[in-house]
């Protein structure tokens, strides 16, 4: 089983504790995602002007891009309470009913991993979202009866990394749908500089830029790398982070300029050395790496594919010429492109 990686996009307990201190509270402080910010500003102002609860919001995208942070920002901008829960926690319809009946008018209910709600819970959520009512069964057997409970108008914010797993009836009940994209190095540099200032870290702009460009387009990873570089600088550089210190810290962490760690490089090397660059089936690759198939598909592959180092074809995984160059190797000229792989037309 893969140990926790420094450049993993999933949250650790340390991340959650640190996020509380550096999390932006207003849209003006929420860096990046400009189209999403512009749209949400309009929706929030319109809802406040009408004195209504804002329409329900679905936020999706890869982990670590700020879905939870955006939900906090929305609640703060609306000036209402935020109740936070997650799909796996809501096991029974009664759990959801308890949450909904304790909301105040216009409050925001945030459900993380909303794709993991059970079908029974979803059935309760539908009328709550549409009509602000829930039907609850009282009693058992022949004496059982259904009662209808009115709810205060509220805004549901659902977050998911896997929007494709949402059922169509649930997805269709969200009036606002926002996709968060990977951040540019310039946006991440601004985030690192802001976080460093809040945490009291002495970090130069070029040091922040070096951290940002290795953060895989993800603020959570950028902030985690900043904390690790801070540790390095505190011991080796009197607490000062500049370009040279950031590079030395990244070398210690084995995070290269592309944001790859040893596991990423090992996967690319395995395909090149053991399978002649591919194609190779995911099961064979997992066995060669002594990793689970799910780890390859959900943890390692996405960023390699997004950056153009790896492709999935009908016959399996293949590395691209870009991967050969990154490993310091010369791409073979006699390998024909597979289906789905970019190649010369002539």
UniProtKB/Swiss-Prot annotation:
GO terms for molecular function: ATP binding; ATP hydrolysis activity; four-way junction DNA binding; four-way junction helicase activity. It is an enzyme of class 3 (hydrolase). SMART domains: AAA. DNA binds at residues 293, 312, 317. This is Holliday junction branch migration complex subunit RuvB. It catalyses: ATP + H2O = ADP + phosphate + H(+). Residues 1-20 are annotated as: Disordered. Residues 257-346 are annotated as: Head domain (RuvB-H). ATP binds at residues 22-23, 64, 67-69, 130-132, 173, 183, 220. InterPro entries: AAA+_ATPase, AAA_lid_4, DNA_helicase_Holl-junc_RuvB, P-loop_NTPase, RuvB-like_N, RuvB_C, WH-like_DNA-bd_sf, WH_DNA-bd_sf. Residues 1-11 have a biased composition (Polar residues).
